[in-house]
Swiss-Prot record:
It comes from the Archaea. This is Pyridoxal 5'-phosphate synthase subunit PdxT. The keyword Lipoprotein does not apply. Keywords: Glutamine amidotransferase, Hydrolase, Lyase, Pyridoxal phosphate. Belongs to the glutaminase PdxT/SNO family. It catalyses: aldehydo-D-ribose 5-phosphate + D-glyceraldehyde 3-phosphate + L-glutamine = pyridoxal 5'-phosphate + L-glutamate + phosphate + 3 H2O + H(+); L-glutamine + H2O = L-glutamate + NH4(+). In the presence of PdxS, forms a dodecamer of heterodimers. Only shows activity in the heterodimer. L-glutamine binds at residues 53-55, 108, 134-135. The gene is pdxT. It comes from Methanobrevibacter smithii (strain ATCC 35061 / DSM 861 / OCM 144 / PS). Pfam families: SNO.
C-alpha cells in the first residue's frame, strides 16, 4: 500500500485530499491519502502533494519544519500545483525559500492577480482538460540539457505543466475540478517510484 500525503499548510488542501481519494478509488489500488503537517509525517509518505496558497509562507514553513530535508533525503515524489509549482523550482522571480527539486525557473502570478482568474480548455498528457487558473505562475525557463524533464502542457506560449523524474509541477488547480486524471497520473508516478 502507498501513502500520498497532502501537505496541510495552506490552500485547497481538502479539495486535494478529496480528489486524491477519488483517484485512488478509480484506480482500484491499495493506497491512502493523508493530511501531513510535519517532517515525521512526510517521512512516512510515498508521494506528497503541495497545493496552492502563498508560496513564500509555505516555503518558510517547509524549511522551518525540516520538510524540505525529508523530501530531498528520501527522494519523495512531489506534485505541486500553483504555489506548489513555484516551490518545486530552483529559481523564481521573488526572493523566497524554495524546495528546489526541479531544474526550473518559475514566474509567480504570471497570469495576473486574483481578479484575473480564469478557466481555459487545455491539452495535458495528450488529452483535453479544463484548467482553472487563480493567480497562476508559469514556467520562466527550464534546464533543456536534462533528459528527465518533459513539458506536459502549454497555454499559448506559456509552459503550465512540467515533469522532472517523478516530480510534477503545474500552474493550474486540478483539485478544483471533478477530473481525477492528473492526480491518477501522479499516483502512477509514485507507484513506479516505489516498485
Amino acid at each position: 500500500m502507498i501513502t500520498i500525503g497532502i501537505l496541510n499548510l495552506q490552500g485547497a488542501v481538502s479539495e486535494h485530499y478529496d480528489i486524491t481519494k477519488k483517484a485512488i478509488e478509480n484506480m482500484g489500488i491499495e493506497a491512502e491519502a493523508i493530511s501531513v503537517r510535519y517532517a515525521d509525517e512526510v517521512a512516512n509518505c510515498d508521494g506528497v502533494i503541495i497545493s496552492g496558497g502563498e508560496s513564500t509562507v509555505i516555503g518558510k514553513i517547509i524549511k522551518e519544519r525540516g520538510i524540505d530535508k525529508v523530501i530531498k533525503d528520501n527522494r519523495i515524489p512531489v506534485f505541486g500545483t500553483c504555489a506548489g509549482m513555484v516551490l518545486l523550482g530552483k529559481k523564481t522571480d521573488f526572493d523566497q525559500p524554495l524546495l528546489g527539486i526541479m531544474d526550473i525557473s518559475v514566474k509567480r502570478n504570471a497570469f495576473g492577480r486574483q481578479v484575473d482568474s480564469f478557466e481555459s480548455p487545455i491539452s495535458i498528457l495528450g488529452e483535453d482538460y479544463l484548467g482553472v487558473f487563480i493567480r497562476a505562475p508559469s514556467l520562466d525557463d527550464y534546464d533543456k540539457t536534462k533528459e528527465d524533464i518533459k513539458v506536459l502542457s502549454k497555454l499559448d506560449d506559456e509552459i503550465i505543466a512540467i515533469q522532472q523524474g517523478h516530480n510534477i509541477a503545474i500552474a493550474f488547480h486540478p483539485e478544483l475540478t471533478d477530473d481525477t486524471r492528473i492526480h491518477e497520473y501522479f499516483i502512477e508516478e509514485v507507484l513506479n517510484c516505489v516498485e
